[in-house]
């Protein structure tokens, strides 16, 4: 009986890692510049060996931040200036459709004509506070011969508050200085200028679903080896459907709740190695490729413009950069009854997005693609998790609960966000 109990624990442990890794990497709407990847939905009750096992997992967590990692040596900056200060001196340069009778356009033309100096004249900075609360839902169904399928959907509540503008022009700047009539006229008309171009640089508060993931995977395991307890491998491919709310191009700081309307295909592979009946090491990696799409977006009209504020908009083909990720973990499995501890690391990044404007007479492709906001991002994350599973031998229903922390520790062009929360899930084993 004691030997059988050890065998059951061994089986449940290595099957938990198959699904653990599958749910971690295959919840494809999980890699964004504004928060670390969730790593709490999958670590819980060990996976049982029955081929028709059904699982439902929920993870919920949140955090807030006023800081971001900019583009130099993991340095921190204010949240909304992660691409550097905004060059408002040339914000109206080459913008099509200006009205020579409009006071807003006159202010833009006069500002661009003024010869600035290399002392941040005409530059501003934006600050704000970003809050996120997210729920991840994942349904997993085991089939036969190691095959399984998954359906994942996130629900996100995001808000941006305390948005403020700071003039970076130093008082000691030589002519033209902070008191320049042209600059002060621009600042006085700034809100009207944004409104004139259908823009709003303010707060937002929204709740919506993210992008739906449908995944098919295959797992295999090797056990009863001389040195190792087991080795688990799995391979997955899935589709990412654009069910999330798209970015509002008329809101300067708006963030889409998914991948902004782009269809995606994800592939990944994982490995887990168990030793000593209580220690597990593993690694994983994958990539998400997106289909291009033609839509209305904001674009730069001068290579010297910088930041989120772009007055001109037009149709362009948007080709998002590939997202790829890799990581590893170590797990102390069932060190006290059903209690386990886990620590891990993930590196994820998105490559540069490419734009192809439809009207190349109004939008120079070189200028539109010389945009830091299209340049991609990368993120380093530390994961910590503690969980307890309530599995009992002979029971078909096995619940679990856990708590996690996902900590962003470095990167470029990302929010400096820490997400903490909890997860709950259960397995149902069927007998046929």
Where are the predicted features?
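Residues on the lipid-exposed face of transmembrane beta-strands in outer-membrane beta-barrel proteins
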Residues: 135-141, 151, 214-220, 237, ...
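Long, hydrophobic, well-ordered secondary-structure blocks that form the structural core
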Residues: 150-270
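Outer-membrane beta-barrel pore domains and translocons
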Residues: 61-63, 154-158, 219, 238-242, ...
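Residues that define the transmembrane beta-barrel architecture of outer-membrane proteins
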Residues: 129-135, 207-212, 231, 259-267, ...
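Short glycine/proline- and aromatic-enriched beta-strand/turn motifs that initiate or cap beta-hairpins
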Residues: 27-131, 136-140, 246-248, 303-310
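Short loop/turn motifs that connect adjacent beta-strands in outer-membrane beta-barrel proteins
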Residues: 28-29, 43-54, 140-146, 162, ...
